[in-house]
C-alpha cells in the first residue's frame, strides 16, 4: 500500500512526519510512504499570524493537497489545527503525546525569578503573552516568528532576555539549552492539543485501507484528551490565536480537564477544572462548557 503524506518543510514538521512513518511501518511493514513537502502560506511570510489569518494557514494548503488527490493524509502539530475543520476532513489518528508544557529559554545569568523584572521576552502567541503578563504586567513581550532554531538565534540578535517555546518541539528536535525552565501548569497552562501529532484524512476515506491503518496506529488516550481540549476551544468560539488554555489528562477511564481563559493583556484570568469518568464524557463536558460560558469565558477572551 502506498501512502502519500503531506507535510510542511520545516525541520520539526519533517521530524514529526518521519515519526508517523515509523509508526505506519510498525503496523504495516510493506507500506510505501511518500513524503509530499509543501510550503504553507504561514511559512512564506514573517507577518504576525493574527494579521494574515492565524495558524490555520499552516493547515489549509495540506488540506488542499488531500482534497485534490495529491496526498492521502497530512501530518500536523495538532495545536496548529483549527478547532473547527471542514467536514470534508477528519483527524483520523494521533500519536502518543510528547511533553505538553511550555518552556522558557533564558539569557545566561537569569533565573525564572527574574520574570518579576522588566525583561524582553519573545513569544508570538496571545495565550502565552497573556499568561506572561498575568505574572508580571511590566514584561516587554516581543513578537517572534520562524522555526525553533530561527527563534533561538534571534535571542542574541535582538537582545532578548527569554524565549517561550513548546517543550515538545525542543524534545523532538533534541535541542539543549543551558538555561531552560519548564513552566508548571499553574504558571502557564498549555494550548489545546499541544505536544500532539495529528494525522488528517479525507473523511470519506476513514473506512479505506489507509483509514483502517490509521485506526491501528492511533493512540487512544491522546486522541480522546486532545478531542476534549479542542471541543472546549470550539465551544468558546475560539481559534488558535485565542488566549485559551486547555489540558486534559486521562488515566484509565478517569479524566481531569483544566481550562484557563484570559484577556489579551492578562489583567483578567479565569480558571476552571473538572474531573469525570469517560463513560459520562458527553454530559460532563456539556455541563462544564455551560459553566465556562455562564461565568463569562467568551467575553473574557474577546477583551
Predicted regions and their residues:
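Short, structured active-site "lid" loops
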Residues: 48-73
Amino acid at each position: 500500500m502506498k501512502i502519500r503524506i503531506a507535510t510542511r518543510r520545516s525541520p520539526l514538521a519533517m521530524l514529526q512526519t518521519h515519526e508517523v512513518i515509523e509508526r505506519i511501518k510498525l503496523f504495516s511493514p510493506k507500506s510505501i510512504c511518500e513524503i509530499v513537502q509543501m510550503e504553507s502560506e504561514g511559512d512564506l511570510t514573517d507577518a504576525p499570524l493574527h494579521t494574515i489569518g492565524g495558524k490555520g494557514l499552516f493547515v489549509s494548503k495540506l488540506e488542499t493537497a488531500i482534497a485534490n488527490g495529491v496526498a492521502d493524509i497530512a501530518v500536523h502539530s495538532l495545536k496548529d489545527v483549527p478547532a473547527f475543520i471542514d467536514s470534508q476532513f477528519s483527524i483520523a489518528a494521533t500519536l502518543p503525546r510528547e511533553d505538553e508544557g511550555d518552556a522558557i529559554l533564558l539569557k545566561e545569568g537569569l533565573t525564572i525569578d527574574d520574570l518579576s523584572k522588566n525583561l524582553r521576552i519573545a513569544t508570538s502567541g496571545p495565550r502565552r503573552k497573556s499568561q506572561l503578563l498575568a505574572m508580571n504586567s511590566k514584561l516587554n513581550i516581543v513578537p517572534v516568528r520562524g522555526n525553533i532554531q530561527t527563534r533561538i538565534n534571534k535571542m542574541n540578535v535582538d537582545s532578548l532576555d527569554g524565549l517561550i517555546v513548546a517543550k515538545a518541539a525542543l524534545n523532538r528536535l533534541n535541542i539543549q539549552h543551558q538555561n531552560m525552565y519548564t513552566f508548571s501548569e499553574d504558571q502557564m497552562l498549555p494550548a489545546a492539543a499541544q505536544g500532539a501529532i495529528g494525522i488528517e484524512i479525507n473523511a470519506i476515506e476513514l473506512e479505506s485501507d489507509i483509514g483502517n491503518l490509521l485506526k491501528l496506529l492511533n493512540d487512544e488516550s491522546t486522541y480522546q484528551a486532545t478531542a476534549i481540549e479542542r471541543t472546549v476551544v470550539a465551544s468558546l468560539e475560539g481559534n488558535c490565536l485565542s488566549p485559551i488554555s486547555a489540558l486534559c489528562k486521562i488515566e484509565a477511564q478517569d479524566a481531569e480537564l483544566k481550562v484557563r481563559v484570559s484577556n489579551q493583556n492578562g489583567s483578567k484570568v479565569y480558571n476552571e477544572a473538572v474531573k469525570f469518568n469517560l463513560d459520562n464524557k458527553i454530559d460532563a463536558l456539556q455541563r462544564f462548557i455551560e459553566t465556562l460560558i455562564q461565568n463569562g469565558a467568551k467575553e473574557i477572551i474577546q477583551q
